[in-house]
Swiss-Prot record:
Single Gene Ontology BP annotation: protein refolding
Protein name in UniProt: Chaperone protein ClpB
Record region (Disordered): 1-25
Organism: Corynebacterium diphtheriae (strain ATCC 700971 / NCTC 13129 / Biotype gravis)
Annotated region (NBD2), positions in chain: 556-754
Family: Belongs to the ClpA/ClpB family.
Region (Repeat 1): 6-71
Region: C-terminal, residue numbers: 755-849
PROSITE patterns recorded: CLP_R, CLPAB_1, CLPAB_2
Region of interest: Linker: 343-546
Binding site for ATP 1: 207-214
Amino acid sequence: MAGFNPTTKTQEALQEALQKASAAGNPDIRPEHLLAAILGQEDGIAIPVLRATGVDPDVVRREAEALVAKLPKAEGANLANPNFNRDALSVLNNAQELAGELGDEYVSTEVLLAAVARGTNDAAELLTKRGATYDVIKGVFPSVRGNKKVTTESPEDQFQALEKYSTDLTARAREGKIDPVIGRDQEIRRVVQVLSRRTKNNPVLIGEPGVGKTAIVEGLARRIVAGDVPESLKGKTLISLDLGSMVAGAKYRGEFEERLKAVLDEIKSAEGEIITFIDELHTIVGAGATGDSAMDAGNMIKPLLARGELRLVGATTLDEYRKYIEKDAALERRFQQVFVGEPSVEDAVGILRGLKERYEVHHGVRIQDSALVAAATLSDRYITSRFLPDKAIDLVDEAASRLRMEIDSSPQEIDELERIVRRLEIEEVALSKETDAASKDRLIKLRQELADEREKLGELVARWNNEKGAINKVREAKEELERLRSESEIAERDGDYGKVAELRYGRIPELEKQVAEAEEHTVETTMLSEEVTPDTIAEVVSAWTGIPAGKMLQGETEKLLNMEAELGKRVVGQSEAVVAVSDAVRRARAGVADPNRPTGSFLFLGPTGVGKTELAKALAEFMFDDDRAMVRIDMSEYGEKHAVARLVGAPPGYVGYDQGGQLTEAVRRRPYTVVLFDEVEKAHPDVFDILLQVLDEGRLTDGQGRTVDFRNTVLILTSNLGAGGTKDEMMDAVKRAFKPEFVNRLDDVVIFDPLSQEQLTHIVEIQIAQLAQRLAARRLTLAVSDSAKLWLAERGYEPAYGARPLRRLIQQAIGDQLAKKLLSGEVRDGSEVHVDADLDNDGLVISAS
């Protein structure tokens, strides 16, 4: 139509109307098609306009679709491209006229909607019947469009931009959807002070991730709603700007800038009534910049920030502030820094107490106060890579979630009984097919047993359902209580004191009494645990870090008390070393060790082959059931001074900077481990300087500036300095090789004694048991006679070399012979292998049976 200048959305609506008419078999396009097409656009302006009139757009769209379905149908060649009928052309003319009246350069969809309502057709009648007359629709334009004119083909980005690209935090606070903020009064007061300035009233919250920067802004929103702010902030609206949704879908150059400008214009036109919050403030630097253009979000808001027309609260981490904001001095000077530090453990407990009720209602479980204290203390001690209160809140959340999952899934007793019943049912089916007397007798007994088990199962399931029902009833009552408290706060703000009195002195106390009674009843339940305890928190800590933080079970206590005997099964004749290591582990597990130092740090001295490395492996096996579960650093690889970089990671600017160090990365991934520095005397002396902090403070900073926690590791250094000398000579050798400050930081220097002939006999037993374990894979049984063991102990005894010659001897005397016999077929898989001494030929004889 000549002179008709539609926006992109209007063009799409016209095209959709054409398609609807064609698909329905209608000979022409009518206003009904136009109305159905306009209201089918989810992101158009017509829907918010119709909603502003108090009419439900979905209902009108369905009724318009019904009108289209009733229109006369035709058959013919022109159905693929129907024309507008007289009523539809009249709508388009009216729309063009109205656009001119409004000063619009393009006809937008809300103007087209008003034009449909102005006509004398069925679509207009439908709108009028619902109360959306031409005058009513036109009357709500200012509330939706503001004072903006349609000057582009896509005005939708400019209308209601704030509603689209932001979240109203004050509205969420009114609805009770924001968690309470405990403490942080000083930081909130500082933010309020900066916001109350005349110019540059833009605070930026800077702190580590998880310390509660966003929570401070949410706390401010709650205070604004409660009126607990200075006059300059009373009644203000606090919005959170979503830059992500603003950038998303901006296909053409300038589209993002258009959206941002529309948002900024709305904020400006509010004349200081809106405070804007941008989480991850550093994202404004570079957001929306294209090619060589310097026009990004940061540069667009600078003038507004300087003049005080935009009150902006930002939040970002220290690293990102330094990396993005500080580089732009003009942007940085417009912000006032508010540093948010990590709260202390005591403050974190207070924060958790404030959030406790929300988490209890969400998960439907009770949380003990001691569990909150445990969450703060254990997270502070063991989860060192994150910050309070975030990590403590996560612990409580996951512990409650774990408990809820256990409540919802069937208990172990029911599980076991169900398996027994299933097994008996299968057996019953099998026996019912048998005809012999024994089977029939067994079937009678089995059916009786099955009936008993089913009865037991039925009772347990009924009891479980009752307990679960009681717990769920408490949960529902708590949810209702939370809703009533929120209603009471809203009524108090609205001045409805009658409702406040009814809720606070009637329904809320009554419900609180019901909850208390129901909780007393659920305490008596035995099948289901519905209380988060310190042990539950400790289990979650153990799952996250691998550190056994919970109470020791009886079995573990006995295991720790008998630790020397357990380690002695692998390490023979070194009782002093075994006792020293066992004492260190027991101290740590019992909680009497210094929490700021490693569990234990030892220097093992002694000749080669006496069990220094073997003790480290035995300790790893004792603690983790796997002797390879340790960090082993072979110090002979660190003979050069520059090799220290491999332990902690290369410094910035060097190749491999982003890969981390061999020591620091391994301990960061597994903070509860055994670290073995083997053959330390082979390393360059400067390598030990980096271990000083580890031994004293239990921490080490890697090449990327991250602090790695060594407080839950056992550090073992092995060396054969002064081997063969007396104890004093060995200690003198240590003092010559290592600096005093290094030796002084070790828990103990343990000297390993050379092995005696008798001790070697025990080692023969251990080595043969290991060989038998390897042969078990081929179903071979190994039987070694006492004379053969004695022969091995005598021939393998070389005091200067320890137990290693014995291992070589077993390999040659038994392993080599056995390998040949297996390959030749003399010994087959599944055989029993006998090893005897052949004293005449000074060797061993292998036979199979």
